[in-house]
Amino acid sequence: MAHSAFAPARRRWNRLPPFAQHLLKSLLIGAIAAVVLHVARPYVPGLAGAETTATDWAIRFWQDRFNTARTTDERFVFFDIDERTYRAWGEPLFVPRDKLLELIRFAAEAPARLLVVDVELAKHVPLTPRPAAMSSSPTDGSISMEPDRALADYLRRYSERSGAGMSSPTSLPHMVFARTIGPRAQSDDGPPAPQGDGTLREERPSEFLEAVVASSPLLHWASPLSDRDDDGLVRNWRLFEPTCLGRAPHAIPSMALLSWAVLRTPLMSRGTFTPASFQDELERRFAPPAATCVDARGSMPPSNAFPTPWVLYDGVLGKRLILSAKPSDLEQRIFYKFQMTTTLADSFLRVPALLITERTDQPLSPDLVAGKTVVIGSSYEAGKDLHETPIGEMPGAMVVINQMNALMEFGQFQEVSRVIRWTGLLLLIVVFSLSFSFFTKTWGAQISTLIINAVLLPVSLWLFQYGWWLDLVFPLFVLQAYQKFIDIDVTPPPVIRRHRHANEGT
């Protein structure tokens, strides 16, 4: 019965010319190879590594080839506590708070557009101020105080200026401070807390700034953490961090995410945007269950308990920003643009902190940082804050700058739509089939690879600079699978013919 049902289709198939039969078989094999690889994609050896290598190469390709005509006008200044500055300050164990105050005051009074401080501020350092340190405000009595107290008093008065209306809100830049985040502390009577990617981290409150920041609408804590891959490279950001603060569940945004939110003011589903409302909503959505913070052995909730993603919209770029507890590798990828040696005066400028704190006869002009995003950080070797990235080694503050720039200039990396991906893949399968039908297997493979490199590679690179990713690795794997499968049915086995001699059998 089944044999007779397929008889009409078989007759139509037999009427097709051999070339058409060969082409249709090739198309079917290519489609099967694509579907099988798509389903088994997480388990295909080498595929994830090849895709990571491809994005690394694309980042390095565009690093020095950026078009200066951009949709955004993000400009960054890095106040670098470099090796020379560190030695001039007497090689202190902690960044001197009186020097840090001078850097903060210089940027705030310029005024900068935003100030990000990537310096450890959890511990109180009871030191007396250095007599060589000169304040930009000689009448300010804070210079005779203990440095930590002077810094706290300045930040308190800075916030009060906003509340009292002494300065317009736009003239007082927001300040984002690096929150110290580490492993959970072990309880006195309990077993040691487990460590690893699946365990919660704990925020370490500042011993002298906690109350000042908590009561201010302009001062904020944020996470400086990033992900380090198995090969030691920092490729991915962590846009937020579920944590415990004391024994209470909490969620803290990354320095890049909070900076993006302050400058882009995304639409909120509940009322008007403010940094406080943004952080409250982030905590409401992504804070861990309360029980996990009570028990020191608490770990991240199981995968089926992860909250739904929070989709925000960047009106400047016209792109979505997806906050998820389980983001894809592509959604976390950092588009690195700046190195320590980058010379892009319109986009990035590195200023040794020594030029600001150690006054000379020709102090720097505040116009140098006015209207720009200022990041204070360190690059001296003893600070142990140097990281390997796809474009080379850089200090943690430079990683933060690249994260902020990536979010605001390119947005979160997203794949092109599924319709475009599969349409393009089917067209490539047609090209594979035609190549293998017109030419030998060797020539067909070479021509197919050439077409991918000549067409798909330029298109993928062009989209990459705008934060879109058109995968060129997966089609190459499909081509390899196609070459393996095509011998199964398309290539007929060789036929050995035996010729009988005329006198045989006589």
Model segments located where?
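N-terminal Lys/Arg-rich, disordered targeting/topogenic segments
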Residues: 1-18, 497-506
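Transmembrane alpha-helical segments that form the functional core of multipass membrane systems
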Residues: 413-488
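Solvent-exposed, non-transmembrane regions of membrane-associated proteins
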Residues: 295-306, 310-328, 362-364, 369-372, ...
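Glycine-rich, charged/polar anion/phosphate-binding loops
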Residues: 63, 358-362
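Hydrophobic residues in alpha-helical segments
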Residues: 364, 407-408, 464
